[in-house]
Curated annotation (Swiss-Prot):
Cofactor: Mg(2+)
InterPro entries: GlnE, GlnE_rpt_dom, NT_sf, PII_UdlTrfase/GS_AdlTrfase
Protein name: Bifunctional glutamine synthetase adenylyltransferase/adenylyl-removing enzyme
Taxonomic lineage from the root: Bacteria, Pseudomonadati, Pseudomonadota, Gammaproteobacteria, Enterobacterales
Reactions listed under catalytic activity: [glutamine synthetase]-O(4)-(5'-adenylyl)-L-tyrosine + phosphate = [glutamine synthetase]-L-tyrosine + ADP; [glutamine synthetase]-L-tyrosine + ATP = [glutamine synthetase]-O(4)-(5'-adenylyl)-L-tyrosine + diphosphate
EC numbers, comma separated: 2.7.7.89, 2.7.7.42
């Protein structure tokens, strides 16, 4: 045995001072002194358990002792009665055996291949023992999971990565995938669980038993992220679910990972053979598959970027010529030719490397250089980790640990060790570059593009730095990285084929480049990723955004400006087609052309296909709404025009809905026979409120009432004859149904018909005579106020003229000023008590004092008060033109009318913009103080003082 170097002999004196009495210096062998000097982990362990050192001295580690691990552990567990005891014994056993492995490794008592085998089998032994103990415990608690035939179902565990390959390093995570064979339920328990529940609960307990730190440490850090759908997927999957996933969605990196997958424990059972046979076609293709080279090149590029980004210098695993590159070289041949060459299907690297040489896929010299380099690097890695049982592959910077490694690797000093290391890594790098290729030199533009790809593909952590986000604040940068990470997790839950992922990988760097250049990058990205989640399984939409950069830019600018638009696009991705043509996107349909446009749009849908008709109506409305909002955001539509467009659009929809309902009712019952004596349909739709006043907002509902002029004795003329008035009732019900039916494109409009005579208690459709009688003899003042903002939005000329005459007659009735003033004011106070002042320190733009409703009440009061003297006041139903009429007819001073108009349009404009932001209609208390003061003064003047 090589004597300790001078620095290590000096350090031995420090070790001596730590040793307890049973471990006196004179009682220790030279081997013990060497190992205790080299490894703080061994030192701490034998100080806590001196008997372990005695055992090591009397029974030194052997190369084949891994064959006894299972029996030794079973003996340790035989008296364990609870989970806490299980956790304790597993941790102590792991530590005891790791001390033996560290001893053998430090003194080179066994080969490096034996060390890797012992480390891997120790992990497998601990995992299987924990699984079997917990399976028995869970079966006692919940019953035994069985398939439909009553056969017990086991939990199979795939060990991935180095664990699967039998090449585990000294201090390592373990990558696992859990699976069970067939669906069914537990039998014999206190209550029945389905197998998915049983194995999920058991899997959670198994992870806890292995992973949770206690005063005895942990067994292994467990990583389950290699399972289908990653962290967002089920913890345990049935064989059928595994097969579906890998057949439909398995990605190249998952093939790469699955090469090393090994079933832990009994790997020759029926279910183990079934699982292996199921996975083999996914991993090893029957044809020679050269596409894998580019996939591995991409993965290596990601790793290289991570090394640069995280400053991982001196990393013997990830650095150029490191362990990972040897693994890549070997797996290139496995993935390209493994389906044809069974000798390449080994999970372990060294046997596969020998097979590669025998098949003359690499020269004997290259294969030998890789073998020697691999064993050198793995010994160096394991020695490095065994110093403190620490998961690291970065060479130390301190003198003590450098001296330790130089001595254990059998070099005189650190420079000699690093010289040999450099030679090995240079050999590896040469073979890697010849086989897989290195990144070619990039232009500045290509480098920038690469950085955006890195941002998308490399799953950066919050504390990672990347130059493309340097202009953002720290909070925004972290938020952007979190959004990207969350989006990627969400993608793992979705069924996205290879083509979809390919398109996404092309689209996302461009999208991130455009979004992250904005100051509001985080907010915009949050809206767009929410939208993308809804369309990732529909490759056509991804291709649209990928292939039409202008459409992508429009999408970004609209989503940045309005979460309402982002939500609409997310709910109804068909609207993405609208982004293709900026000429139509930012130019809404002419106000008088909506009916014609809709008629043309509906021609593409069969008249007898009601479902498609409903969808078409909704899709047309959403597309037009998007155009109006886009023009609003672009500033090409002032507030009055926005409402005009929204109102004309609603009228076109009403027209089409009545037409559809009419056709359906006539086909069923025929037409009411009184129509034989007159033109038209004898039916009208009256719009109240915002619709009647040309003041619709983006999310306004429609206040409608339905009128007819059908005589009492009229009947329909169809084969299924019904009463004429019954026909109009069913027509109105059908209209309500067409508006409110929820399809995949949502509803058309919320419709409120409670303003009809007698409200919700009244008939849904009213005869024109009954309506007139009600307004004259029963209606309340507030119903006459509502009539000020009412107009026919659909109807034949005869009924329209009748309604207009009734409206004019009611509004021009002489009214006693004080009584009217009191009734209007009291109604407003009731509304304010019910709707206003709900938000402390906020101003509700519509409902609070000085807001929009006050202006509406002022105009309604003045029309009802003075229309009997000035009948022209009844001409218009919208507030702005009523204010003009009040000024023109010398009821209100022009200056006041103009000021109220400005206040009204300003407040309405703010409501539109809040709707675009999906924000409620209230603002800070100190907003719009001038407008509110003006409205209060006008209210005082007309409704209090007069």
């Amino acid at each position: 045995m090589k004597p300790l170097s001078s620095p290590l002999q000096q350090y031995w004196q420090t070790v001596v001072e730590r040793l307890p009495e049973p471990l006196a210096e004179e009682s220790l062998s030279a081997q013990a002194k060497s190992v205790l000097t080299f490894s703080d982990f061994v030192q701490d362990s034998v100080i806590a358990h001196p008997e372990w050192l005695t055992e090591l001295e009397s029974q030194p580690p052997q190369a084949d002792e891994w064959q006894h691990y299972a029996a030794w552990l079973q003996e340790a567990l035989c008296n364990v009665s609870d989970e806490a005891g299980l956790m304790r014994e597993l941790r102590l056993f792991r530590r005891r055996i790791m001390v033996r492995i560290a001893w053998a490794q430090t003194l080179a008592l066994v080969t490096e291949e034996s060390i890797l085998q012992q480390l891997s089998y120790l992990a497998e032994t601990l995992i299987v023992a924990a699984r079997d103990w917990l399976y028995d415990a869970c079966c006692r608690e919940w019953g035994t999971p069985c398939n439909a035939q009553g056969e017990a179902q086991p939990l199979l565990i795939l060990g991935m990565g180095k664990l699967g390959g039998g090449e585990l390093n000294f201090s390592s995570d373990i990558d696992l995938i859990f699976a069970w064979p067939e669906h069914g339920c537990t039998q014999g328990g206190r209550r029945e669980l389905d197998n998915a529940q049983f194995f999920t609960r058991m899997g959670q307990r198994l992870i806890k038993v292995l992973d949770q730190p206690t005063q005895d440490g942990f067994v292994y850090r467990v990583d389950m992220r290699l399972r289908p759908f990653g962290e967002s997927g089920p913890l345990v999957l049935s064989f059928a679910a595994l097969e579906d996933y890998y057949q439909e969605q398995g990605r190249d990196w998952e093939r790469y990972a699955m090469v090393k997958a090994r079933i832990m424990g009994d790997s020759e059972g029926v279910y183990a053979n079934e699982l292996r046979a199921m996975l083999r076609p996914f991993v090893f293709r029957r044809y020679i598959d050269f596409s894998v080279i580019q996939s591995l090149r991409n993965m290596k590029g990601m790793i290289a970027r991570e090394v640069r980004r995280r400053g991982l210098t001196d990393n013997i695993k990830l650095g150029a010529g490191g362990i990972r590159e040897i693994e890549f070289i070997v797996q290139v041949f496995q993935l390209i030719r493994g389906g044809r060459e069974p000798s390449l299907q080994s999970r372990s690297l060294l046997p596969t490397l020998s097979a590669i040489a025998e098949l003359h896929l690499l020269s004997e010299n290259d294969a030998e250089q890789l073998r020697v380099a691999y064993l050198f690097l793995r010994r160096l890695e394991n020695l490095l980790q065994s110093i403190n049982d620490e998961q690291t592959q970065t060479l130390p910077s301190d003198e003590l640990n450098r001296a330790r490694l130089a001595w254990a690797m059998d070099f005189a000093d650190w420079p000699q060790l690093t010289g040999a290391l450099t030679a090995h890594m240079t050999n590896v790098r040469r073979v890697f570059n010849e086989l897989i290729g290195d990144d070619e030199s990039e232009t500045q533009e290509e480098s920038l593009s690469e950085q955006w790809r890195e941002l998308w593909q490399d799953a950066l952590q919050e504390d990672d730095t990347t130059p493309v986000l340097a202009h953002l604040s720290e909070d925004d940068r972290k938020q952007v990285l979190t959004l990207i990470a969350d989006f990627r997790k969400e993608l793992d839950k979705r069924t996205i084929g290879p083509r979809g992922r390919q398109v996404l990988d092309h689209l996302m760097p461009h999208l991130l480049s455009d979004v992250c250049a904005r100051e509001d990058a985080a907010v915009t990205l949050s809206r767009i990723t929410a939208l993308l989640v809804g369309i990732v399984t529909r490759t056509t939409y991804l291709e649209l955004l990928s292939e039409f950069p202008a459409a992508l830019k429009h999408l970004i600018s609209l989503c940045a400006a309005s979460p309402m638009i982002a939500s609409q696009l997310a709910r109804y991705p068909l609207l993405l087609d609208e982004l293709l043509d900026p000429n139509t996107l930012y130019q809404p349909t002419a106000t008088d052309a909506y009916r014609d446009e809709l008629r043309q749009y509906l021609l593409r849908v069969p008249e007898d296909d009601e479902e498609q008709q409903l969808e078409a109506l909704r899709q047309f409305k959403q597309a037009q709404l998007l155009r109006i909002a886009a023009a609003d955001i672009a500033g090409t539509l002032p507030v009055m025009k926005v409402s005009d467009h929204l109102t004309w659009l609603a009228e076109a929809m009403i027209d089409a809905v009545v037409q559809q309902a009419w056709v359906q009712m006539v086909a069923r019952y025929g037409k009411p026979n009184h129509l034989n004596e007159r033109e038209g349909r004898g039916f009208a739709v009256v719009g109240y409120g915002k619709l009647g006043g040309w003041e619709l907002g983006y999310s306004s509902d429609l206040d409608l009432i339905f009128l007819h002029d059908c005589p009492m004795d009229a009947m329909t003329d169809g084969e299924r004859e019904i009463d004429g008035r019954q026909f109009y009732l069913r027509l109105a019900q059908r209209i309500m149904h067409l508006f409110s039916t929820r399809t995949s494109s949502g509803i058309l409009y919320e419709v409120d018909a409670r303003l009809r005579p007698s409200g919700a208690a009244g008939m849904l459709v009213t005869s024109a005579e009954a309506f007139a009688d009600y307004q004259k003899n029963e209606a309340w003042t507030w119903e006459h106020q509502a009539l000020v903002r009412a107009r026919v939005v659909y109807g034949d000329p005869q009924l329209t003229a009748h309604f207009d005459a009734v409206r004019r007659e009611i509004m021009t009735l002489p009214r006693e000023g004080k009584t009217l003033q009191t009734e209007v004011r009291e109604m407003r106070e009731k509304m304010r008590a019910h709707l206003g002042n709900k938000h402390r320190d906020r101003f509700d733009i519509k409902a609070d004092e000085g807001g929009i409703t006050d202006i509406e009440f002022i105009t309604q009061y003045l029309v009802l008060r003075y229309a009997h003297e000035k009948p022209k006041l009844t001409r218009w139903s919208d507030n702005v033109r009523i204010l003009e009429l009040l000024a023109q007819n010398d009821i209100m001073e022009e200056q006041e009318a103009m000021a109220l108009t400005r206040a009204y349009t300003t407040l309405r404009d703010e409501l539109h913009h809040l709707a675009l932001q999906e924000l409620p209609g209230h603002v800070s208390e100190d907003c719009f103080t001038a407008e509110r003061e003006l409205v209060r003064a006008s209210w005082q003047k007309w409704l209090v003082e007069e």
